[in-house]
């Protein structure tokens, strides 16, 4: 069923926080790190900005369906594939989603296991993978509002921890930002390749952008003819959430 106005309880700021939470994860720095030393640190940042800007534009264009009509990905895809045929792109979309869920659950559980072993001497990675996965499933099942509330706590915390780790690592290796950005790349890959790599991290989410945007508050009705007025909130949230993170 389409999302009705009273169910649209997510502000543009809350949506921005949600995307910061989505983007602030280990996959982001891991992806960027794989591009060095083929590209310089500055080139990697430029590739990250360009790649995520393209993804943000795609998210906004496809998310327009959710903003205007309040329908999710599983519904709007039927217009192209039919009622039964819609299962095919649904399955294709589910494969990378399952992979990323498993991979990131393992990474999170591995970090928790390392902390637990350091503090208590006890280690049980399998148990933590199960518990961590269950917590994520419960949080998701509680709906977008529960996810948003969790991100209000998680996003700033992760950003602060990331900054602390950055400063700590730089001090340990006696590095400054000027020294980091003075390093060049060996040209092993092109900028175009790097942009595509950075796009690949979140490009699959562009398909189901309406799953998020259908909960956005709108000051205008779904029949508003001005595309920018309807979608500017989601565009800025996507852009600054992805690029800033």
From Swiss-Prot:
Q: What is this protein called?
A: Uncharacterized protein in hyuC 3'region
Which family is this sequence assigned to?
Belongs to the purine-cytosine permease (2.A.39) family.
- Its transmembrane ranges are 13-33, 42-62, 71-91, 95-115, 127-147, 150-170, 187-207
A GO cellular component annotated for this chain's UniProt record is: plasma membrane
Q: What is its main location?
A: membrane
Per UniProt, the keywords (alphabetical) are: Cell inner membrane, Cell membrane, Membrane, Plasmid, Transmembrane, Transmembrane helix, Transport
Q: Where in the cell is it found?
A: Cell inner membrane
For membrane topology, the record states: Multi-pass membrane protein
Q: Which organism is it from?
A: Pseudomonas sp. (strain NS671)
**InterPro entries named in the record:** Pur-cyt_permease (IPR001248), Uracil/uridine/allantoin_perm (IPR045225)
Q: Which Pfam families match?
A: Transp_cyt_pur
Q: What is the lineage of its organism?
A: Bacteria, Pseudomonadati, Pseudomonadota
Question: Care to name a GO molecular-function term for this sequence?
Answer: nucleobase transmembrane transporter activity
């Amino acid at each position: 069923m389409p999302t009705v106005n009273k169910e649209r309880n997510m502000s543009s700021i809350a949506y921005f926080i949600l995307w910061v939470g989505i983007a602030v994860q280990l996959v982001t720095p891991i992806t960027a790190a794989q591009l060095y030393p083929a590209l310089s640190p500055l080139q990697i940042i430029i590739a990250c900005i360009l790649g995520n800007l393209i993804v943000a534009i795609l998210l906004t264009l496809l998310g327009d369906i959710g903003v205007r009509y309040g329908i999710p990905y599983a519904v709007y895809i039927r217009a192209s594939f039919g009622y039964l045929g819609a299962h095919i792109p649904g399955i294709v979309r589910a494969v990378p989603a399952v992979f990323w869920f498993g991979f990131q659950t393992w990474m999170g559980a591995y970090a928790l296991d390392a902390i637990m072993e350091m503090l208590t001497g006890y280690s049980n990675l399998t148990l933590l993978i199960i518990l961590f996965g269950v917590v994520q499933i419960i949080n998701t099942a509680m709906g977008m509002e529960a996810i948003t509330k969790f991100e209000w706590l998680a996003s700033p915390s992760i950003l602060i921890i990331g900054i602390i780790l950055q400063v700590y690592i730089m001090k340990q290796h006696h590095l400054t930002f000027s020294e980091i950005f003075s390093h060049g790349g060996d040209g092993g890959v092109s900028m175009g390749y790097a942009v595509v790599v950075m796009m690949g991290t979140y490009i699959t989410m562009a398909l189901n952008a309406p799953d998020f945007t259908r909960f956005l508050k709108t000051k205008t009705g779904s029949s508003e003819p001005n595309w920018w007025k309807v979608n500017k909130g989601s565009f800025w949230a996507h852009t600054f959430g992805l690029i800033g993170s």
